[in-house]
Regions:
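Conserved alpha-helical substructure of the radical SAM core
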Residues: 1-107
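Conserved phosphate-coordination/catalytic loops
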Residues: 33-37, 121-125, 283
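Glycine-centered loop/turn positions within well-structured domains
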Residues: 15, 246, 300
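Flexible mid-to-C-terminal extensions adjoining Fe-S/redox cofactors in radical SAM and related proteins
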Residues: 1, 23, 252-334
Length: 334
C-alpha cells in the first residue's frame, strides 16, 4: 500500500555534489522542472490512494518557485510534507523555510554532504545557530542525511558524532540517516564502499551510545544488524524531474528494465499498477539466498544495488529483472 510519494520538482541546484543521484545542475541549458499542475494532480491522487506523506526534493526544492503552494496544498489535504534540502544557510533561505513552516511543512531533512560539494559554501550561519532560528516557536522536526561513499567515509565518524552531540539536546532534532552510496547519477563505481569500509560502518553503529539517533534503513540490512523491510514499488514511489515514476531512490533514472509511465500522461494509480512496478513487487520474495543463515536479516540485500550491479542487456526484460532481484547484493558480507 502506497504511503509516501517523493517528487523531484527540479534538477536545479547550486551545490554540484559529486555523488548526486539526480545529476542536479546549475547549468541553464540543462535545467528541467515539473509542471505545477501535474504535480498538484499527483498530490491529490496520492491522497486518494491512501498516502500520508509527500516529500519534495530535487535538485534543490527551494529553487522551485511554486513550492509554497504545493506545501499548502499537501497540508490542506491532511497529509504530511517533508523537504530534502541542501540550501545555503542564509537569511533568504531562513525566510523560505519559515514561510513553508507557516504553510504546514512538517519536516526538513538537511544534507551533510559538505565534503562532496565542489562549490564554495556561501552559508552565513553555522548549522546550530541557523536551525535554532528556523525552528524557533514551532513543532517542526529536523533530520540529516549523510551519504556514505569512499569520498565521505573518512569523515563519517566525526561528522555523524559531532552532529548528534551538537543537536541531540534540541527538541526539534530527529535523527541522522546514513544513506548507502549507489553508483548511479553523478556517482561512479570508484566511489563505492569496500567490504572493509562496510564493516567499519557496522562497528561505528554498534559502538555508538546514540543508536536511537542514527537511522540505517533497508540498504544496510547486509550488515546483519537488523532487518528493515524493503518497500520498493510498494509503500513508496519517486517522481523524477523527467516525470517518470520510479520504484525507489536506488534506481532513479534507470529505465532499461521498464518504465512505469509519466505524470504527463498517466495517473499515479496507473503507474503504481504498471507491469514494471507489479513485477518488482512479485519478485521481491524469497529467493536463492533464502537458505543462508543471514537471510532473515539481510533478505539478500538492496534490490536497487542488485539491479545496477547485475544488469545485462537482454530482450527479455522481465526475466532479466527477475534474475537481478534473485541475485545477491554486490556487497554481500558472507
Amino acid at each position: 500500500m502506497l504511503k509516501e510519494v517523493k517528487i523531484e520538482l527540479t534538477n536545479k541546484c547550486s551545490r554540484n555534489c559529486k555523488h548526486c543521484s539526480s545529476n542536479a545542475t546549475s547549468r541553464i541549458g540543462n535545467l528541467k522542472i515539473l509542471d505545477f499542475e501535474d504535480v498538484s494532480r499527483i498530490i491529490k491522487e496520492a491522497k486518494l490512494m491512501g498516502a500520508d506523506t509527500i516529500v519534495f526534493t530535487g535538485g534543490e526544492p527551494l529553487m522551485y518557485d511554486r513550492l509554497p503552494e504545493l506545501v499548502e496544498l499537501t497540508s490542506k489535504l491532511g497529509m504530511k510534507s517533508t523537504i530534502y534540502t541542501f540550501a545555503y544557510r542564509t537569511d533568504e533561505t531562513l525566510n523560505k523555510y519559515r514561510q513553508l513552516i507557516d504553510l504546514g511543512l512538517n519536516k526538513i531533512v538537511y544534507s551533510l554532504a559538505d565534503s562532496l560539494s565542489d562549490e564554495e559554501d556561501i552559508s552565513v550561519d553555522d548549522k546550530v545557530e541557523f536551525f535554532d532560528k528556523v525552528f524557533e516557536n514551532n513543532n517542526l522536526r529536523l533530520g540529516f542525511h549523510y551519504t556514505v561513499s569512499k569520498d565521505s567515509f573518512s569523515r563519517l565518524e566525526s561528522g555523524v558524532t559531532e552532529t548528534i552531540e551538537t543537536f541531540k539536546s534540541r527538541s526539534y532534532f530527529d535523527r541522522v540517516s546514513l544513506l548507502r552510496f549507489v553508483p548511479h547519477g553523478k556517482g561512479t563505481t570508484d566511489m563505492d564502499l569496500s567490504k572493509e569500509e562496510l564493516l567499519a560502518i557496522k562497528n561505528l553503529y554498534l559502538n555508538s551510545n546514540d543508536k536511537d539517533k542514527i537511522r540505517l534503513g533497508t540498504p544496510w540490512n547486509i550488515l546483519g544488524i537488523e532487518n528493515t523491510p524493503c518497500i520498493i514499488a510498494d509503500e513508496i514511489m519517486i517522481i523524477g524531474f523527467d516525470g517518470i515514476a520510479y520504484p525507489c531512490d536506488s534506481i532513479k533514472y534507470f529505465t532499461k528494465l521498464g518504465i512505469s509511465g509519466n505524470i504527463r500522461e498517466n495517473s499515479l494509480m496507473e503507474m503504481y499498477n504498471s507491469e514494471y512496478f507489479s513485477n518488482i513487487r512479485k519478485f521481491n520474495t524469497d529467493n536463492s539466498c533464502s537458505t543462508c543463515e543471514q537471510y532473515p536479516i539481510c533478505k539478500s540485500g538492496c534490490i536497487g544495488q542488485k539491479i545496477i550491479a547485475n544488469y545485462t542487456e537482454s530482450e527479455d526484460k522481465v526475466l532479466t529483472l527477475k534474475r537481478c532481484i534473485n541475485s545477491r547484493d554486490p556487497k554481500c558480507m558472507r
